[in-house]
Amino acid sequence: MSDSATTDSAGTGGERSASAPGDGTRAVRAGLPEPVKHEPTLPGPVFAAHFHLPGDPTGPYTYGRDENPTWTRLESAIGELEAPGEAGVETLVFASGMAAISSVLFSQLRAGDTAVLPDDGYQALPLVRAQLEAYGIEVRTAPTGRDAQLDVLDGAKLLWIETPSNPGLDVCDVRRLVEAAHAGGALVAVDNTLATPLGQRPLELGADFSVASGTKQLTGHGDVLLGYVAGRDAGAMAAVRRWRKIVGAIPGPMEAWLAHRSIATLQLRVDRQDSTALKVAEALRTRPEITGLRYPGLPDDPSHKVASQQMLRYGCVVSFTLPSRARADRFLDALRLVEGATSFGGVRSTAERRGRWGGDAVPEGFIRLSVGAEDPDDLVADLLRALDETTE
């Protein structure tokens, strides 16, 4: 793939103007300070619980739970990727993706409000639902596919979208859902974890919040826990910031610095991983023992049409089902280049049988495969070999 915002194999969810820098340039330059002679290009992490603060306490940095220069640079970088060239977008970073998700839901909703969540999303969402309901908030759920959340929007205060969904990889029409939600007075938050800001821009599609776990492909090395929220509405973002301060859901300076460093290679990583994911999906579709193969980049995938209208890249996750739990476990054990792990988006390929957790409504033989940055031919060969060696 090229470093432009759109490619021949990806969708048209955002257009690049002739004068705008490409994704690779933006990723490398995102959030960097103005150059100062003899100073580093990307300053190191600032470790500080407090700052010099004589007299009037007004200023950007007062106490370590409120602000940190290392966060500020990272927030600027992510904002430049989520809404390129757009002023007025604020980004806040958090200690994890769940901290970011919770910050939006618990800062925007009150007892008596109604929230709409996907019933096929991230496996921690049922825990969030239970907590919301304990606070007197009504929660309705519907699947991601076929825009089913439209049917339960009436009277909602907030709509939560996860597209593509994890782990099923269904896609919904963000623009259509946003239009309907806003017409009824609801806010819209989109979990953009699987797509990344280079694969989908929820704010451009009309959403009020773009939320993600930076632990996954955004940072991509499997060594950082991080989350973020980006939004345009100053009042809504002030509430998110206040929630972060109250609960202390802040990232460490080292994590923030590692994340910023990693963003420089984001375009290189997503293009390699996403193009390899398509090759993997094309190879797996020929196997008779595999059913339910999903990858939004496949032209015949049920999600492809909608995905091609709003996504710039299709992600690095492929899902499929093997005939049984035993076959799936043998297949995973036989892999040599794919690590058994419960995350996705890293440079090292990972896979797991999602049914082992009990939180996803998937078949026992369902596999979520996160495609890494290995050589495509090597990875495909490893997957096919493992399938051959574990034939029943």
From Swiss-Prot:
Stretch list, region Disordered: 1-41
GO annotations of cellular component type: cytoplasm
Protein name, entry field: Putative cystathionine gamma-lyase
Bias (Polar residues): 1-10
UniProt KW keywords: Amino-acid biosynthesis, Cysteine biosynthesis, Cytoplasm, Lyase, Pyridoxal phosphate
TM region(s), chain numbering: none
Source species of the chain: Streptomyces coelicolor (strain ATCC BAA-471 / A3(2) / M145)
Gene3D superfamilies given in the database record: Aspartate Aminotransferase, domain 1, Type I PLP-dependent aspartate aminotransferase-like (Major domain)
Source superkingdom: Bacteria
NCBIfam families: PRK07582.1
Enzyme class: lyase
Pfam families named among the record's database cross-references: Cys_Met_Meta_PP
This protein's record includes keyword Lyase: yes
Gene Ontology BP, a term: transsulfuration
InterPro entries assigned: Cys/Met-Metab_PyrdxlP-dep_enz, Cys_met_metab_PP, PyrdxlP-dep_Trfase, PyrdxlP-dep_Trfase_major, PyrdxlP-dep_Trfase_small
Entry-annotated residues carrying N6-(pyridoxal phosphate)lysine: K216
Similarity comment: Belongs to the trans-sulfuration enzymes family.
Keyword tRNA processing in annotation: no
SS bond partners: none
Record field: catalytic activity: L,L-cystathionine + H2O = 2-oxobutanoate + L-cysteine + NH4(+)
Major subcellular site: cytoplasm
Pathway: Amino-acid biosynthesis; L-cysteine biosynthesis; L-cysteine from L-homocysteine and L-serine: step 2/2
